[in-house]
């Protein structure tokens, strides 16, 4: 089981134009700061957040309880000119978990409802013995094939097209994909195996000419899984395996303590 939290800014659209449209550069900076905050605060508890649309953020929150969510929510209220609502859900697959969380949030009204404010609710149950499976995917030799040959915008366009194709293919497995910078994608993928990724990469290669590879990590938390996925991808990059997909799994009972994140306000 994977636990997903959907975070949504309350009544954000109307706020951006009240009493007059706000400066776009200020709004972009504010949205980026919120995403940074979400990763620092959930990350301090071994979670991981993805910006999606910036006013809606999806986080993997295995091991993070309701009280911690409430403290994060209060921290945002104290330091931002708006509030956020959160809904939490667990399921066998990432897509199903975010679907349940989204539906729970929608029960309280529209995202632009003036009355709906600081919702915090659980769709089903908190995960106690679940796991997180993440795939860290990147494009083979993007520097040699795109960055050093094409314009910055054309390279960006190729990466975004690859992202869209990857997201569409992942959804067929009830998984999700998120762009995390450069030519990298982080994919919550509970329930998928190496063969699934190989077939998916072959389809993308045939349709776009883009070659992909992936390290897959399985752990108790998003932090554990992402660290293992990063290591798996590095093994491929360094030529230590001929595999296109390399999986690592956290040993049973293995836990790693993280240094306290002093940048986290809670």
Curated annotation (Swiss-Prot):
The keyword Hydrolase applies. Belongs to the archaeal-type GTP cyclohydrolase family. Its EC number is 3.5.4.29. The gene is gch3. GO terms for biological process: biosynthetic process. PANTHER family: GTP CYCLOHYDROLASE III (PTHR42202:SF1). The lineage of its organism: Archaea, Methanobacteriati, Methanobacteriota, Methanomada group, Methanococci. NCBIfam families: PRK02240.1. This is GTP cyclohydrolase III. Transmembrane segments: none annotated. InterPro entries: GTP_CycHdrlase_3, Nucleotide_cyclase, Rev_trsase/Diguanyl_cyclase. GO terms for molecular function: GTP binding; GTP cyclohydrolase IIa activity. It catalyses: GTP + 3 H2O = 2-amino-5-formylamino-6-(5-phospho-D-ribosylamino)pyrimidin-4(3H)-one + 2 phosphate + 2 H(+). Keywords: GTP-binding, Hydrolase, Nucleotide-binding. Coiled coil: none annotated. It comes from Methanococcus vannielii (strain ATCC 35089 / DSM 1224 / JCM 13029 / OCM 148 / SB). It comes from the Archaea. Catalyzes the formation of 2-amino-5-formylamino-6-ribofuranosylamino-4(3H)-pyrimidinone ribonucleotide monophosphate and inorganic phosphate from GTP. Also has an independent pyrophosphate phosphohydrolase activity. Gene3D superfamilies: 3.30.70.270, Nucleotide cyclase.
